[in-house]
Amino acid sequence: MMNSIENEEFIPILLGSDMNVYGMARSFNEAYGKICQAYASDQLAPTRYSKIVNVEVIPGFDKDPVFIETMLRLAKERYSDKSKKYLLIACGDGYAELISQHKQELSEYFICPYIDYSLFERLINKVSFYEVCEEYDLPYPKTLIVREEMLVNGHLEQELPFEFPVALKPANSVEYLSVQFEGRKKAFILETREEFDLILGRIYEAGYKSEMIVQDFIPGDDSNMRVLNAYVDEDHQVRMMCLGHPLLEDPTPASIGNYVVIMPDYNEKIYQTIKAFLEKIEYTGFANFDMKYDPRDGEYKLFEINLRQGRSSFFVTLNGLNLARFVTEDRVFNKPFVETTYGTNQSDKARLWMGVPKKIFLEYARENEDKKLAEQMIKENRYGTTVFYEKDRSIKRWLLMKYMFHNYIPRFKKYFHVKEG
């Protein structure tokens, strides 16, 4: 039974309509029995036909001025009851940035567990993020920053400071969302100089203005990746950290880097390194780090920080660390910090998170000890998904989610290849 502090009336408001939104809505439903309200510019499949999240579609809501005008109107029309608390949670990069930009105005009506925009800008842009990594002695891959003015007739004339293959990705992921060109991917692994010149030229021809990041490709397949989700409270104390070991990624061009199978993991060095960093920069809210093990020097190299919970972060809730509970206890119930809770892989409660059908995992994940352990977890029924939720079942929803999962079969057949380096 809830104690008196948890009887306080609050309403979770989610921004977006993707799997991240559904994972947060499910976390709130599991923890508090809440039905969430979401606002988005489009209705995406993971939240369709749901009984635990109501999505209101507002065209243009993912950009200003529609975003801030709508939020201030909603605040006055629907969220003005002083006896209630309204918790605002972004479930995508663009929405996280919009909340941070308008934090002062929005905080008059909503609880906004986000950092100020000055810090947000430093961390979200990969150029300044790698400068921050230098400052705080965090390992990251060898990097070359490319600016448009460095190109001559659409080509970068200088030699790269490392061998091919290389990784190429935008420094400004929010700006890149609206840039379209032939062969567009979220990020690229390029094998030759010719391929590199072609793609780089197309990106800037398409109107992208910010820097591009060229990096030494760290050898190894998806099983060398790690993902870390953290929650940091209003006083900059890290309340929760949960490390995941991705065993497979989505190979679809628009979704490269999205994890589709994650096993819980534990690494004391990673936990303490990231915890110290978050506290030093006075972070607050959810954070999500992508990193990869480099067998050449034994270090985990940071790729980026997402200033929100990760798209696949329901793996944290699935493993007993309910994401909604951490932010609610901090910001709504004002429960004091006691100690950092760390995710582990040792418990018999450890669960494998799956975003694709089992047959995809069994066919495409690399054969190794981790896969054997994951197969054992599946045999013991110690696995789960974000979108198949027993308290949110209907024929329409079940069929749509089955169709969504089935779609991965032709996608993997068409796009999958092993990343060896």
Swiss-Prot record:
Please tell me whether the keyword Hydrolase is annotated for this protein: no
Which cofactors go with this protein? Answer: Mg(2+)
* Entry's EC annotation: 6.3.1.12
Pathway listed for it is: Cell wall biogenesis; peptidoglycan biosynthesis
- The enzyme class is ligase
Q: Cite the GO molecular-function annotations of the record.
A: ATP binding; D-aspartate ligase activity; metal ion binding
Question: Could you tell me what reaction this enzyme catalyses?
Answer: [beta-GlcNAc-(1->4)-Mur2Ac(oyl-L-Ala-gamma-D-Glu-L-Lys-D-Ala-D-Ala)](n) + n D-aspartate + n ATP = [beta-GlcNAc-(1->4)-Mur2Ac(oyl-L-Ala-gamma-D-Glu-6-N-(beta-D-Asp)-L-Lys-D-Ala-D-Ala)]n + n ADP + n phosphate + n H(+)
> This chain belongs to which protein, by name?
D-aspartate ligase
